[in-house]
Swiss-Prot record:
The keyword Hydrolase does not apply. Keywords: Cytoplasm. InterPro entries: Endo/exonu/phosph_ase_sf, Endo/exonuclease/phosphatase, UPF0294. GO terms for molecular function: catalytic activity. This is UPF0294 protein VIBHAR_03217. One of its GO terms (cellular component) is cytoplasm. It is found in: Cytoplasm. Belongs to the UPF0294 family. Pfam families: Exo_endo_phos (PF03372).
């Protein structure tokens, strides 16, 4: 009997491993996928752009931050159409680069940069930063979940602004399944050190998976080192963990916050964040 149980256990472990390898493909190095119209290019780590253009519109910058839940809900496209209207920058997490999503990008004349953290059944998955204009530079960062071994991702981009400054943008999906905050803090620290080299305005946003007080403290401590302040929402329906703590955040510096709200939506398991800034005079 014990021999049969042992055999069954080994079989389940092998079957699980094989299934994982079939479903998920994890690149050895962080990869970035850029789509401009129907043209798609891929590179390791970073992508440079020869003709970056001004991101803001007449000194205003309207941003959508949203974990889109791999577009698993039937109404994701209708909701994304509505939330992305009049936005210059979309910072999405858990985006799956399916054919349907690629077509949405083409139809909206968007320029996108995605971290291909892993592929699930052939479709790239990871954070994606989307704008009407090309950035100056975009770089991919990944950090593996210590238990699941699937990477979480972050994208660091730099955009030209109309006041002559350069905006640094970090789009993050933070590590989730850990005991303690060591891996969580390490992921944030790498990005915080990159931002230390940037002298201009910064936007740091995404799904921080800040479901515990320890994580919340680690997050705020890391971002305070870059002199960032947190956006407060006048309409705050941000998705919360069972602890009552919000998972999604927006931090910034060198910009003037105009308004911020987090409306409810059934198009994902996270509610979207809609934030508007104005540029500072130079």
């Amino acid at each position: 009997m014990y021999q049969r149980l042992a055999f069954a256990l080994v079989f389940l472990i092998i079957a699980g491993f094989v299934s994982f390898q079939v479903i998920f493909t994890v690149p050895e190095q962080p990869q970035i996928i850029t789509q401009t119209g129907t043209n798609i290019t891929q590179d390791i780590r970073c992508m440079e752009f020869k003709q970056p253009q001004v991101l803001d519109k007449d000194g205003e910058l309207n941003v959508l931050v949203w974990n889109i839940y791999k577009q698993n809900r039937d109404n994701w496209q209708q909701a994304l159409d509505a939330f992305s209207a009049n936005k210059q920058l979309l910072l999405l997490q858990e985006a799956s680069l399916t054919d349907e999503f690629k077509n949405w990008l083409v139809d909206g004349h968007w320029v996108s940069n995605q971290v291909s953290a892993f592929k699930a059944l052939g479709s790239g998955a990871g954070v994606i930063s989307i704008a009407q204009k090309e950035p100056i530079r975009a770089c991919a960062y990944t950090s593996k979940e210590p238990w699941l071994r699937l990477p979480k991702s972050a994208l660091y981009s730099k955009y030209q602004l109309s006041n002559g400054e350069t905006l640094a943008v970090v789009n993050i999906h933070a590590i989730n399944f850990t005991v303690g905050t060591e891996e969580y803090t390490s992921q944030l620290s790498v990005l915080e050190k990159v931002l230390k080299e940037h002298k201009g305005p910064i936007l740091f946003a995404g799904d921080f998976n800040s479901w515990s007080e320890e994580r919340l403290t680690a997050m705020k401590k890391a971002l305070q080192k870059a002199n960032l302040q947190e956006v407060t929402f006048s309409q705050d329906n941000r998705t919360q963990f069972i602890t009552g703590l919000p998972l999604d955040h927006v931090f910034y510096r060198g910009l003037t916050l105009k308004n911020a709200k987090a409306p409810q939506s059934d198009a994902s398991d996270h509610n979207p964040l809609l934030v508007s800034f104005t540029l500072n005079d130079q």
